[in-house]
Amino acid sequence: MQYARRLFKLVGWILLLIVLPLGLGYQVSLYFVPTPQIAVIRIEGDIWGSYTAYVSQALEEAGNDPAVRAVVLEVVSPGGEVSASEGLYFDVLNLREKKPVIVSINEMAASGAYYVACAADQIYAKPGSMVGNIGVISILPSDDLVDE
């Protein structure tokens, strides 16, 4: 009986002095030690002024975040304004100096969107994706012009 009581106390002290601090340290590390992450930034629709500012900010935040180890750009865009596309192109080039940048083309990356994608380290496209030339202009005629 005395032996069992001593053994129980010894096991209790071992748990209290060794296992409990290790468990607490692990739990605390989950909150304070950053885990490696991959940022996913979507470029959807037309590339133009205020939308470009949003994407530029996301690229800058990903570049400055030490937990982010790489960036994936998901592109579904027919392109857009020349100056806006060029701005994003240079933002991606700047980000590429800090971290790997991968582009995933879903459905379409034409004109300015393809220009932005060319700044990445690697480009992946689905087999059915439409990938167009830089500088392509796509205009649908309005109904008024068709009637003439």
Predicted regions and their residues:
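Small-residue-centered hinge/linker elements
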Residues: M1-K99, M108-E148
